Amino acid sequence: MENPPGLKPAPFDDGTWNNLKPKTPWGTLPTLELPSGKIIGQQRSILRYLGKNIKYRENFLYPDKNEDAVLVDSFMDMLEDIWPILIGLNGPESIETAPLYSTMLGLGTLDDFLNPRMEEGKGDLALQFDFLENAIDDSGPFLLGQNLSCADILLFSAISWWGSAVFPEMDAMLNARPKIERSIRSVGKIESISKYYENLKDSRKAMPTVGVTNYADYYKNFHKLCEIS
């Protein structure tokens, strides 16, 4: 895909990916370099690895208990089931059913495609978000109650991203789903996470505008949830 002339930094691949791809284990991003120097890939595998090695308030982000672990895995799997619909199963070649590609190419959100699928009690996407809502522990604030897990981190990232790169706002996903909102707001208040996004805010401002899409806006919900002004 060629970049629109005169845009810096280039919003699409500038050739870097062609050089990097052969060095990745699965031909995809993200990747993570382990202390041994080995490179691993696949998003959820990376999340589980990090979750087994990172603690929050004395608890690992990937649970030790098998029953809790399967709840975390199934929740993350459900989030991944939503991705193909929002990206577009046929990619940019079928742009009218590719919500993410539509905004990336500066064509705006595909409301006519998304709104029926998010209709309460009827839409297939709405049902999937309802499943996520119902899976979260009632006592909260997180999926497993008081214990933060990597599933909550993935939910925070997904809702923030989808609420700017696919939907005009997060509202369509959060309306009548208070537990999802409670979880992502709680994640955003974690100091290390808010500092991470705060440190990157200025660099996001340098991102280009393509058509009606200001690429910096892709990060607006991360800043909102982290209460970064």
Please identify what each model-predicted range represents.
Residues 45, 179, 192:
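Residue-level recognition of oxygen-bearing side chains
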Residues 51, 55, 158-159, 197:
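Active-site-flanking alpha-helical
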Residues 1-119, 138, 219-229:
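GST-like domain detector, emphasizing the conserved glutathione-binding G-site
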Residues 41, 61-63, 143-145, 174-175, ...:
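Generic, ordered loop/turn and secondary-structure boundary motif
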